[in-house]
Amino acid sequence: MMRQSLQAVLPEISGNKTSSLRKSVCSDLLTLFNSPHSALPSLLVSGMPEWQLHNQSDKHLQSWYCRQLRSALLFHEPRIAALQVNLKEAYCHTLAISLEIMLYHDDEPLTFDLVWQKGSWHRTMPQ
């Protein structure tokens, strides 16, 4: 009987830990993107406004950017098991990216959307 009541409690504890893990990863990613001394290569973070002005429609460069960002994030965030990086918008003064993240010990994907505006990254809610 004791085992049954313990099993009923475990999913809730796991759910709270998963929620906490997701919030922690999102917070750490936003900090990583906005840190003046970010571990991410500067072109991937602060170099974006200059890149957008000249190459916003270059599909090869957009693909390169996504690959480089994916590689850097996987290197710097060990809690990510799988990651897909997509450009949602690439305009003159706005860049929007979407990160589809699978975390270790989490069965549901996490979508993390960011937009570059006015010199910094901001989190947006997925649509």
From Swiss-Prot:
It is found in: Cytoplasm. Its main location: cytoplasm. InterPro entries: Anti-adapt_IraD, IraD/Gp25-like. The keyword Cytoplasm applies. It comes from the Bacteria. GO terms for cellular component: cytoplasm. GO terms for biological process: cellular response to oxidative stress; DNA damage response. Keywords: Cytoplasm, Stress response. GO terms for molecular function: anti-sigma factor antagonist activity. Inhibits RpoS proteolysis by regulating RssB activity, thereby increasing the stability of the sigma stress factor RpoS during oxidative stress. Its effect on RpoS stability is due to its interaction with RssB, which probably blocks the interaction of RssB with RpoS, and the consequent delivery of the RssB-RpoS complex to the ClpXP protein degradation pathway. Interacts with RssB. Belongs to the GpW/Gp25 family. IraD subfamily. This is Anti-adapter protein IraD. It comes from Escherichia coli (strain SMS-3-5 / SECEC).
